[in-house]
Structures are given as structure tokens and as C-alpha cells.
Amino acid sequence: MGMWLVWIFALDNILCASKEEEKKCELPRRLGEMNIKEITEKVEIDGLDTKIIIPFIFHDAKPVVSPITRYRDISQEERRYVEEIIKGLPKLVWDSMVWIYVPGYTWWIKSLMDNVFNATSFEGFNPVDLYKKAKGKSEIRFADLVMSIFRFNGRIVNRFGQRLVREVEVKIKEMSNEMPSSEKKEKEERLNQILEYGKKLCTREKQEEMLKAQKIVCDACVYLWEKGSEDRVAITIMVYLRNLEVQMIRSSMKKVKVGEPLTFYMNHEVLISAYKEYKIGVAGELVKQVLKNDKDIDSESVNRVVCSIREREEDERKRAEAESARNREELLRMEEREKGKEKGSKGKGRKKRGKKGAGEAKEESKEEDRGGEEEESVEADVPVEEMAVGGARPKKKSPKEESKGEERCYKVHKRVLRWMKSAERIKYELDNGEEEKWRGRSIEEIEEQKALHDIIEVLKLLRSKECDKFFVRTGKYMKGGSERWNMVGVGILEEGGKKRVGNVEVGLFEGKGGENIIYHLMFKPTDFEEEGEGARPSFGRCDGVDAIEEGRISDMSGFQYPPGVRSEITSSGSEFRIVWKNQRDTSLVLRSLTVLRIPEIR
């Protein structure tokens, strides 16, 4: 729901219009093809929920301030930018603490919020100075600064609650008896909602709940940042994706200021309860889930996260045991080889032994040479042909050149290649396939999925030396009897004039011959919905596929595109862009995918 908050904040002047007719006329003009009904339905129900702030500051594609960043850690060229963001934090925090949207009443509530905030004396509290001037042990992290601002603003929550209650009571008394009964009833219900909310804000329990929830979020972000590289990368990319969405929304609204910490809905009671019972690990996963899915949490969310963590721990235990068993077997084989050599040397004469030893050395040398040849032949068989424009085939590389790019060579599972076919053919294969979740889909659904899955040109980037600048690798895990891992990038898909931000997902597993096999390739938008999505809070996992038939793979040898131009590929240091065109009229662009360079993480 965080992105809906951005829409609402960006559209303050429209949504606060006194006349509903003005709003309905202005929204379509500003939003273009956005689904107006969907937005208004969202804001109808999102008014009184609790909110939290994620303690990150981004500048372009770089996290310039993380939860643990101290002022001295910020580069000189970024300090002025960061200071400008921090100057606005007290107001951003205030809005996140008490802001509500109620149709027909937003303008005076917003005005009251601003009046209470502006009437507050900030003498002796300057967040920039607090962040800059602390020295030694008193030097604070950014997460600590955010909490200091929350505590300072907490002093005036009660004052705002009291003012809100008084003004609502006046409005209820002033309601005209001549008003139609249905309209009067609707207004009374909304005003009573606001009244109850204002009374809650006056209680110490509510004020403490706000601070506790935000403290847990800050601690969870620190925990994820310090836990390990995979969690650090995961939360950074999730925040980066949401910042890209904010940037797109605000640029469409001609509001260019982007970079301040993001605000999300997150049920305070559920978060605090989960933290008390399961501690920081579960809280961290819940924060990741909110960032990933842009949805509030509930008790079911907590249960799914707890189960997911237990499954992951069990998975890691099994992997560790399997690795230990492999190491023991390898040690036994080495010991047996040594014993065999000792027995062979005892029954021989010295001269013969010397000759035999030389012979053995030669034989071992030959075996090593053969082993190298075998490795090179396997390596030569694995590379995927580049998806060149017009079906051009790349120049054949020598075995030595290919061995240098060992990690860039992949085989492709046929479940990935099927998305290159027509929607009708794909539907036929899915309806008669083994994956139950794909059966019975309509042609319209297949065409929507094809736009997300038919991105085989991404393999050109995966095979390049630039791959690691655009994709991050996740840890390995077990699923369906195979060891899997994933590569995750960030992209923007544009089709029909609509831009969607999301992850470029690559799912891989190791074949019996040791080759890397791609079984999942997809652009997954941040607004993507699928069954069981909430059950998979882990970053980058492509768990929608159970057992995989290894026999159904291809190294793409001999593959040619149909005559004509399917796509054009351009690449720069910051982006890899694929543009798909109409093969009959290449001036018509069907869609495009831009894979962006991942944020620099220090």
C-alpha cells in the first residue's frame, strides 16, 4: 500500500478538492491511463491504517544513506543532498504518524495537521545538526536519527488528537437536518471514524505503539543490513525498486523530489506482537515482505514468515549435512588411492619400481590431459548461442576462450523456451503439461504472461562480462530434489505506453553433468499477483516450480529467429535495453525491457 500513499501525497491538491466533480475531472487528466476506479477504491479503505518509515536515502541508483550510516560515512559530494532530505524529515515523519485520508474531509484534516506542526517550537532540535555534530561514542546512525525525530514528534501527537476530536464534534453538531438521510448517515459514519481515531491518538498506549513499531522497523533494517551480504543486497534492491516507482509517479505529477525514506502501511499491533514472540529475525522478514509485496501484514503473514524461516533453516541443515557427507567420501577416496599406491610400490624391485613410477607419472599425466579435454568438450557444448538481431550466429570461440567464461555458459530448459511460441501453442502445451497452476488459462492470460516471460534476449547479458553489474546471485536452496539458486536484476518493462518496474528473475539448477540450467526466466513487476505469493517472502526465490525434468533442456545449438527483426539490443554502462518490434513493420515497437545496473552497495 506504500505506493498508493505516494499517489495520494502527490495528488494532495486534487484529492483535497472540495468538490467531487473537480476530482473526477482532474484525476484522468493527470494520471492518463491509470485505473481511476482502482485508485479511489484504494484510498477509500487506506485512510486510518498505521504507517512506518524505511530508514534509507537514495540518490539516483545509489543508497547514499543506509540504516547504519553515520554522517562521517557520507561522501563529500552527497552531503548537501542528504542534508536537504534530513531537513524535511520531521514533516515526513509527522505525516506518517497522523496523516489520514477520508473522502470529503481531507482538506481540513491536512490543514489541522499543518497548523499543529507549524505551531510547534523546534528550538533546540535541529536534525541536521544532531546528525552532523555528534562525535565519538555519541555519533549516531541514520536509524537512530529517524527514531529521535519520531520521539520529538511524539510530543505533539496528543495535541493534534485533542484538536481533531474538538473539530469533529463541532462538525457533527453543525450537520444540517435538511440533508438527505442517506447522505447524512454516510457523513456521520466518516466523522465518527475520525472521532475514534482522534481519541486513540490522545492515549499513551497509541503513542507508545507508534514509537515501538518504528523502533522495531529501524532495528530490523539494521539487522538485515548487518546480517550478511545476501540480506543487505535483498533489502537494498527492494528499496531501490520502490524508489523507482516513486520516481515514475512523481515525474508524472511533475514533482521531482525523490530520495527521502519511503513510507509504508504496516500493522503496528501485528508487528509488535510478532517481535515479542519471535524476535528480530521474523520482524526483518516481515519488513522485507512489506517492501516486496507492498501489502500490509496480518497474523497469516507472520505464520507464513515463521514457516518460511523454519523451512529455510531445515534446508540449510540438509545442505550442510550433504556437503559434509561429500567431503567425507572424498577423503575416503583419497585415502584409498594413497593405500593403493603404497601396496603397488612394495612388491616391485627398486629399478623396476623407478621405471614403473615414471610410467605411472606418465599415465597420470595422460589421465590429467584427458580430463582437461573432457572438461573443455563439456564446456564447449554448454554455451547458449547469443540472441543476435535477425538470427545472426556468433563467431565460434576456442575452447580456451570458452573456459574463461565458465560461469557465463548456460543450458536452457524448454519451459523457458516455450514462451517464444504463439499464445495458442503455449496454451496447448500448458493445458497438456505437468504444471497444474498453468492449466486452463485463457488466451488473454497467456498473452499477458508471454509479455513477462518471453525475454530470452536477456541471456546475452547473462553471458557477458558485465553480468555481475546487473544481477545479484542468491544463496542456494533445495527444492523438488534439486539444488537451486537465482540471479535477480532490476528492470522497467514498457508496453502500450505503460511502464512497470520490477525484478528480472533467473532461476537455475545444476544438471547431472555439472552444467548450469536456466529453468525460470521472467520479468516480475512489483504489482505482480500470483497464488501463494505471500507464502514466499524470501528474496529472489522462484519456488513456483517443483520437480524439474532435466532431460527437457537445450543448449540452443542451431536456433535461429524467424526471418526479419525480432528485437534490437543496446547496452551501456548503466542499462541493457531490449526493444521488440513488429517483424512486418519494424517501425512499430511492441514492448521494451530495460535492465538497470544494480545499486552500488558498500
From Swiss-Prot:
Residues 370-384 have a biased composition (Acidic residues). Pfam families: DUF1609 (PF07753), DUF3654 (PF12376). Residues 313-345, 357-369 have a biased composition (Basic and acidic residues). Residues 313-407 are annotated as: Disordered. Residues 346-356 have a biased composition (Basic residues). Belongs to the UPF0329 family. This is UPF0329 protein ECU02_0060. It comes from Encephalitozoon cuniculi (strain GB-M1) (Microsporidian parasite).
